[in-house]
Amino acid sequence: MTNASNFKKILIISSYAPPSMSGASQNIYNLLRNLPKDSYSILTSFYNIDNISAKTSTWLKGKYIFYDKISASDLLRTQSEIIKERPSRLILNKLKYLVKRIWFLGALGGTFIMGSQIIMIIRAGIKTIKKEKIKIMIGFSDYGPAIISTYFLNKITKKPYYIFFFDIYKDNFYPVFPASILAKIFEPKILKNAEKIIVTNEGTLNFYAKEYGEKIRKKIIIIHNSTFSEHYLNLYNDYDPKSPYTILYTGSIYWPQIRSLKNLIKAIEEINDMDINLKIYCPNPKDYLKKIGITESKKVKILIAPPQKMPEIQTQADILFLPLSWHTKSQKIIDTATPGKLADYLISNRPILIHAPSSTFLAQYAKKNNFAYVADEENIEKLKSAIKTLLFDKTFTKQIIENAKSTFFKNHDANRNALLFQELFK
């Protein structure tokens, strides 16, 4: 049995910690799930935990400190408690609308919001480090506040820190001003002062090694996005697709996925010689999806389910769709990303269809390990052909399913990766 005394006391700093429903949040949960509850504390945002997540997703065992609502720290665990403390959604929506519509208000509001977050995290962090006898910190990437605050807490308290990048930082796309400016200023400082830098794939490692040289490369450790195989293994059944066929996408939908997902919808709408549909399970509001051009139709269904249901849903699909888009706001983020849901897909015992540019690490990783059909051209006819190959070429499909499971156990098994993560703090 793992004992808290075996570990340095850790302060987890994240804007979007579990139980928030996101790939990054789920990966944090997977890495920390088996750590003794007294070995770490979590400094995070109360207001980034939505009501659905609070009710249906899973909280970590460690102590929560909410930097934006200290009075709620380590007390709230139910939907009713979260809702009771929640500000008016109508007021928040009106403020967000004004900020988006008026650039000056957006710049002013964004500066105030980011500045306030950083100050709150630092203030709460100083108190927590002293009270909880923290020995080391780890900042998880967001749009800036968590990792910038980690850097400043190191300067103030002299406690060492690691940085965990789910995506590249400086060259990402941030809609909130002044996130991009701050990223350009602080990324070199954050990397220089970090004891270790954790990334989720070789593409990101190579990107930072090229950008900053050998000294930074030596600090970098790869811990792939992961999930627990036991959630899936008991759900397996033979892959034998029958009409009506179902393509499945699970996860949030933002600018990195939108164009590629629309290509799939177009391909499905044009397939008239068989009964096929797309099911999208995502937490995004339907009004947001409508605004970006993704709506329900006879062949497209938009649904929502808690993370605990995803293994059952994914293992019943005929094809699992994994998109990254062309002509986006940040090609560098597209080229270095590995979506968190990849780990789920690999162990699902179902074929994966990747629709992403050939320049992406995701496409190259899949081809190298032959675990998916990679449609790396933005061509609707070839995408339709890929769908039919996965449904009807059973020899090919069986091979990529087996290769996917092999890749999972090599790189994406949360039981293994959690141990790699734990070793960093002994």
In which residue ranges do the predicted regions lie?
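N-terminal subdomain of nucleotide-sugar transferases
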Residues: 1-75, 196, 268-275
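A charged, aromatic-enriched C-terminal amphipathic alpha-helix characteristic of glycosyltransferases
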Residues: 378, 382, 392-425
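Membrane-proximal helix-turn-helix segments that form the acceptor-binding/catalytic region
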Residues: 30, 112, 119-126, 145-148, ...
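Conserved donor-binding/catalytic core segment of Leloir-type glycosyltransferases
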Residues: 11, 239-258, 265
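Acidic anion/phosphate-binding donor-loop and adjacent secondary structure
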Residues: 54, 73-78, 175, 221, ...
